[in-house]
Design a protein with these regions (language model features):
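Short, solvent-exposed polar/charged micro-motifs at secondary-structure junctions
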Residues: 7-8, 90-91, 162-165
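Conserved beta-strand scaffold positions in the cores of enzyme catalytic domains, especially
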Residues: 43, 99-100, 152, 175-177
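Leloir-type glycosyltransferase catalytic cores
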Residues: 158-178
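Short linear motifs in intrinsically disordered/low-complexity regions
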Residues: 12, 20, 26, 51, ...
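Secretory-pathway luminal glycosyltransferase catalytic domains
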Residues: 1-72
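Compositionally biased, intrinsically disordered/low-complexity regions enriched for serine, proline
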Residues: 38, 142, 152, 169-170
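Residue-level marker of intrinsically disordered, low-complexity segments enriched
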Residues: 15, 78-79, 100, 174-176
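Donor-binding and catalytic core of enzymes assembling or modifying cell-surface/extracellular glycoconjugates
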Residues: 73-160
Length: 178
């Protein structure tokens, strides 16, 4: 078993994977009604939860990572924050500007669908983030283009000191790792 966070496992069938993981029309239509309220939204994912108690394996990312990633976009871009700790996100000074909206998603399917409909991504060191961004690259659900040409910003620090995993194949070549 594994997280399969390397497109080298399935690059030869990427279109099929994206098609198979397409969202049900009901969820997709609900998410489209939300996403049209934003102009070129950036998906920003923050994973805390179990990472706070398991930081030796998966450390939560600091606000400095998100600040640096945000600086790679125009300062007026709208950002939708997805997190398992929305209360904490709302308390952070970095996200207090009106351009930030915290998703109060009813479930992970809706959050993943909304993420995949965004124009650009700032991902956490999380399989949920990774898949949300990867599925959007060539999303098969119209009316998205057949090729995703947005930015994906990913953290260089993916694992903690207890896990000495090689991450060279973790990120697609067009993702920006900081």
């Amino acid at each position: 078993w594994g997280f399969f966070q390397s497109e080298k496992y399935f690059d030869h069938i990427a279109f099929q994977i994206r098609d198979d993981f397409g969202f049900k029309d009901e969820i997709l239509n609900e998410c489209r009604k939300v996403i049209v309220q934003f102009d070129k939204p950036i998906s920003l994912h923050i994973r805390r939860g179990d990472f706070l108690t398991n930081s030796g394996n998966h450390p939560p990312l600091g606000l400095d990572y998100y600040e640096k990633a945000l600086s790679m976009f125009e300062s007026d871009r709208q950002v939708i924050i997805f997190s398992d700790d929305t209360k904490w996100c709302k308390e952070q000074k970095l996200f207090e500007d009106d351009r930030f909206a915290v998703s109060e998603g009813s479930d992970q399917f809706h959050d993943m669908c909304l993420m995949s409909l965004c124009d650009d991504f700032i991902i956490a060191n999380s399989s949920f983030s990774w898949w949300g961004a990867w599925l959007a690259k060539n999303i098969c659900n119209p009316p998205r283009p057949t090729y995703f040409d947005g930015k994906v910003i990913a953290p260089k620090k993916w694992f903690g000191p207890n896990l000495n995993h090689d991450t060279k194949d973790l990120f697609p070549p067009d993702w920006i790792v900081i």
